[in-house]
Amino acid sequence: MSKIIGIDLGTTNSCIALLDGDKPRVIENAEGERTTASVIAYTQDGEILVGQPAKRQAVTNPKNTLFAIKRLLGRRFEDEEVQRDIEIMPFNIVKADNGDAWVEAKGKKMAAPQVSAEVLKKMKKTAEDYLGEEVTGAVITVPAYFNDAQRQATKDAGRIAGLDVKRIINEPTAAALAYGLDKQGGERTIAVYDLGGGTFDISIIEIDEVDGEKTFEVLSTNGDTHLGGEDFDNRMINYLVGEFKKEQGIDLKSDPLAMQRVKEAAEKAKIELSSAQQTDVNLPYVTADAAGPKHMNVKVTRAKLESLVEDLVQRTLEPLKIALTDANLSITDITDVILVGGQTRMPMVQAKVTEFFGKEPRKDVNPDEAVAVGAAIQAGVLAGEVKDVLLLDVTPLSLGIETMGGVMTKLIEKNTTIPTKANQVFSTAEDNQSAVTIHVLQGERKQSSYNKSLGQFNLEGIQAGSRGTAQIDVTFDLDADGILHVSATDKATNKEQKITIQASGGLSNDDIEKMVQEAEANKEADKMFEELVTARNQADQLVHSTRKQVEELGDALPADEKAKIDTAIADVETALKGEDKAAIDNATQALMTASQALVQMAQQQAQAQHAQSSQQTNDTTGQSSTDDDVFEAEFEEVKDK
């Protein structure tokens, strides 16, 4: 069996590792570096450059040098965060025919997975050069808070790169594998704080060893898929551009070449300020006007950088609280804190994490390499090279379908261990309904419209009947990669329809963050909406059953009673068009009062039928009943569920 490699496909940098014997090893690329810049350049002579060679020519080729493409994976062009990126990226982000966010280089439009595949190709080539053989299998990591569309897009990138993606695993989980594989002892609970180039994740993971088998179980995860080192860089870029404009009166944002130089200088200054208290940004001949060339010379202190990004660091703390709450743990339950991602080298980040958890983060984990090392370990598990390791990951957000009244009915709750499977039986909402639409949603809100639509499909050819009689079995199958497969089956006809959620229906990065935060902030609104829908459904059901009883009684129902009931039904239907729960409740109560005569007549009719049936039974059996003891019993019919 050929070697399976582990790849950390990062926003800013990527890394590859594999098992060398029984030890994971990070492989150096052709330039001798252990990490590869996630930068892709399309040159004038048709060459595609990846990594440091691409970065080196970026100043002279800014429009065709692409970076931070991971931020576009599984994204729609209209997404708010994509629109923000359009304003600051030197290259063109364009709208694809299907609405996805694509990029343009040398006049050619390309999908984000297509561009990311170039980085994966370099990773693949690096491994093949080291091993001296072809490599096809890979485990690729993604942020824990990546949604279905983003995970699918990552797999697509692997496929384009010629890789068989054996597994998609979450970056914090991979880091936990790298940290905990060789740790001896009993149970420990760790917090993995992963602040990378474009995303932030926090995962609470329990590591336990029982009978020689080491288990890594993710208890909860949270995060922000639009928060990372690139955002820190942008704050520095805006500061430098602003200072230059104040001094020279020239706005560099309209000059792609100048902005590329400023970007490189900002990133360099940010890194230097992790070890120095101040640094100078010197860019001679950054631009020119009628008076001659202009030079940038700005002194930046660590304190200034911290003031620019303080709110970004603060944004990482709320997900920490939610993750602990979801795991039913307190800060004192955390044994170790692991920092992952290059941005965690910033002293301010380390200080905030230390202050939050009340303990220093571990220093024995390489934040740039731990994720790739963990991916290599998981690759070894899949290849049978690593024994006695069990990885139990979770889904970050709840999954469900839209049901009557615009409610999201959850089939799989957030933080459920994957792979997992869940099913639920639903029925039709209308009489003689021959088709249903299965609308798949992801999020935490009760109201469907506040969650993200992942896709929808129709199940047709349902056996016609009155509402509620057809039974539709909906099954959600969430695989180990966190990718969802949905099927719906009509139990009467066994007709089935399936769908695998595709990237075009995925979530945007801000959407996921907003869903969870809004769910926390809008619990009361959700409760009121749920009560409104319940009232609506009860009223609708009462109207349906009342009309049915009126039809069954026919002429036996006095005309004045029928008129009262018809008026009450009309009032309910009017109330149902509004959003006032009290009005619906009042109209429902009025209908119940108006239909009391109907109920009494139905009961009298049933009693008369019962009496007639009993008389016939007595006439038939009276002569044969002698001295034998006769026992009466009630039998309850048990129906198959």
UniProtKB/Swiss-Prot annotation:
GO molecular function terms attached to this record: ATP binding; ATP-dependent protein folding chaperone; unfolded protein binding
InterPro entries assigned to the protein according to its UniProt record, in alphabetical order: ATPase_NBD (IPR043129), Chaperone_DnaK (IPR012725), Heat_shock_70_CS (IPR018181), HSP70_C_sf (IPR029048), HSP70_peptide-bd_sf (IPR029047), Hsp_70_fam (IPR013126)
Keyword ATP-binding: yes
Positions of the UniProt region annotated as Disordered: 601-641
Sites bearing Phosphothreonine, chain numbering: T199
Chain intervals with Low complexity compositional bias: 601-616
NCBIfam families according to UniProt: PRK00290.1, prok_dnaK
Name of the featured protein: Chaperone protein DnaK 2
Primary gene name: dnaK2
